[in-house]
């Protein structure tokens, strides 16, 4: 039987690559994203493409109509510049994961993947230069540096509780600075690797010998 997957946030950078990979392995893919289709990073004609606001439970129900596995990469986010200036907006993404989990459980979906972030780690652990490699348990005691990190950490816990209470097969992955083909490189939503590459190219074109780098 052909697997049927929902890629929530599939119009975004990582979601677009995931949808392409799933389609390439013969999976029947539904892509749901809030952006108009002409703003999707990649659009796959073989997928069932839906423009939906997944903060709405009814939209989640529609997106899940033909799915038996969920990949949730949907959220309102960007680079640190975007996160710092849109803290409340980033927190709204908790509605997406809450509604998707609830609807998935009610519709009998057993497999659920949640895209978390390294932003869940405490602020003080990100300011120490002599720190050893982070472990999963280093997320606690919890003190993420911003609303985006708190939203991700809460959503991780919610996923865990759905595993404990309903037996759903839940997996969580904490992404860091992701970049590559089709990635954002300007406009404030880009991550550090892409932003630094852009600044270097712009500096060379402008004859400048300096670029601005955030953090220390």
Language-model features and meaning:
Residues 124-133, 157-216:
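NAD(P)-dependent short-chain dehydrogenase/reductase
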Residues 4, 28, 110-111, 169:
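Residues at the starts of beta-strands that form the adenosine-phosphate
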Residues 147, 151:
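Active-site helix of classical SDR
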Residues 8, 72, 111-116, 171-177, ...:
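Structural signature of the Rossmann-like NAD(P)-dependent dehydrogenase/reductase core
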Residues 17, 21, 103, 158:
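Rossmann-fold NAD(P)-dependent oxidoreductase module
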Residues 54-93, 103-106, 123-124:
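NAD(P)H-binding glycine-rich loop region in Rossmannoid oxidoreductase-like domains
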Residues 98-146, 171:
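Conserved Rossmann-fold NAD(P)-dependent oxidoreductase catalytic core, especially the SDR/UDP-sugar
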Residues 1-76:
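N-terminal Rossmann/SDR dinucleotide-binding element
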């Amino acid at each position: 039987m052909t697997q049927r997957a929902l890629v929530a946030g599939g119009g975004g950078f990582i979601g677009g690559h995931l949808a392409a990979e799933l389609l390439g392995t013969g999976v029947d893919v539904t892509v749901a994203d809030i952006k108009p289709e002409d703003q999707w990073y990649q659009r796959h004609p073989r997928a069932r493409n839906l423009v939906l606001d997944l903060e709405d439970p009814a939209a989640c129900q529609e997106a899940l109509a033909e799915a038996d596995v969920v990949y949730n990469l949907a959220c309102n986010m960007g680079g640190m510049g975007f996160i710092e200036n849109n803290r409340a907006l980033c927190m709204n993404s908790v509605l997406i994961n809450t509604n998707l989990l609830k609807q998935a459980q009610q519709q009998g979906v057993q497999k659920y993947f949640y895209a978390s972030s390294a932003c869940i780690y405490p602020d003080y652990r990100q300011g120490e230069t002599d720190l050893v490699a982070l472990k999963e348990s280093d997320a606690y005691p919890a003190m993420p540096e911003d609303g985006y990190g708190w939203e991700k950490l809460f959503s991780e816990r919610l996923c865990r509780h759905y595993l404990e209470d309903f037996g759903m097969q839940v997996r969580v992955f904490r992404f860091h600075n992701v970049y590559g083909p089709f990635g954002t490189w300007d406009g404030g939503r880009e991550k550090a690797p892409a932003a630094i590459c852009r600044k270097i190219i712009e500096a060379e074109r402008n004859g400048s010998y300096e670029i601005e780098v955030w953090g220390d």
